[in-house]
Amino acid sequence: MSLNHDDSQDAPQPKAKGKIATRRVARSLAMQALYQWHMAGQSLNEIEAQFRVDNDFSGVDGAYFHELLNGVARKKTEVDQAIAPNLDRPLDELDPVELAILRLSTYELMQRIDVPYRVVINEGIELAKVYGATDGHKFVNGVLDKLAPSLRSAEVRNHKR
């Protein structure tokens, strides 16, 4: 699925009710913005401003959207270094949508310990089901399942008890 900016307007956005839903929409929009950043090479400020104009942000956790978009970009090298050992191919050979989802989810695993790791993984899978290739969600699930124990070792250990 090609995901340029015009496609993002056609993609269904979940209706937001409460903190969980507004963050889900923020993740979806942040993933699309990260995809655009990767593909078009526009500045983050331009992309963020464009997304805020082109999308209804009334049901979006705007601060979370901003943090995810800018945080992934700021920590891109660190995020990519965490992802790379868990892949079966180089980062530059990944589907760009799946790469955007993995970067977003990895950033959350690394920086947002207030969000349970299972939530991060499930949200990444859901994004891949909506925007990724046919079996993209399985790939995203596999990579995030490998990543979680190294980034959230105590939480994963406690969950498995």
Curated annotation (Swiss-Prot):
Keywords: RNA-binding, Transcription, Transcription antitermination, Transcription regulation. Pfam families: NusB. It comes from the Bacteria. The keyword Transcription applies. Residues 1-20 are annotated as: Disordered. GO terms for molecular function: RNA binding. One of its GO terms (biological process) is DNA-templated transcription termination. One of its GO terms (cellular component) is cytosol. Belongs to the NusB family. Involved in transcription antitermination. Required for transcription of ribosomal RNA (rRNA) genes. Binds specifically to the boxA antiterminator sequence of the ribosomal RNA (rrn) operons. HAMAP family: NusB. This is Transcription antitermination protein NusB.
